[in-house]
Design a protein with these regions (language model features):
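Conserved Nudix-box catalytic region and its N-terminal flanking loop in Nudix hydrolases
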Residues: 12-51
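HhH-family (HhH-GPD) DNA N-glycosylase catalytic core used in base-excision repair
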Residues: 39, 46, 50, 54-60, ...
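NUDIX/MutT-family hydrolases
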Residues: 81-83, 90-124
Length: 126
């Protein structure tokens, strides 16, 4: 799995809520998704951002990774800094979008796999 850490000039981060009816519905997360067979993480993240938000991104540097095991599966999540190069983020899959200041990140209900990154960003160290 891959996820984009997109930050605006005012310091706010882009997060999306998981749509109703999905696994972990309603939780806020960094946008992204699964790596398809034959894709690189970079290709997968660019595809997911277009499919989910209608934006083109430039994938920049890796930020961190997270491993989480739940009752359904093991998840290895790769987080990359990304910059929107075309389009305006639009919720194309029934999710909500929000731009959150670092201090607000810790107040959001998020999946366990995002917890360490949120702690880093909220502390200003990532």
């Amino acid at each position: 799995m891959v996820a984009a850490v997109v930050q605006r000039g005012d310091g706010r981060f882009l997060l999306a809520s998981r749509p109703e009816g999905s696994h972990l519905a309603g939780l806020w997360e960094f946008p992204g998704g699964a790596i398809e067979p034959g894709e690189t993480p970079d290709e997968a993240l660019r595809r997911e951002m277009m499919e989910e938000l209608g934006v083109e991104v430039q994938v920049e540097v890796p930020v961190t990774f997270a491993f989480h095991r739940d009752e359904e599966r093991d998840v290895l999540l790769l987080f990359y800094r990304a910059r929107i190069t075309a389009g305006v983020p639009t919720p194309l899959l029934g999710q909500q979008l929000g731009w959150f200041a670092p201090r607000e990140l810790g107040t959001l209900a998020t999946p366990p796999a995002d917890a360490e990154l949120i702690a880093l960003l909220a502390g200003g160290t990532a």
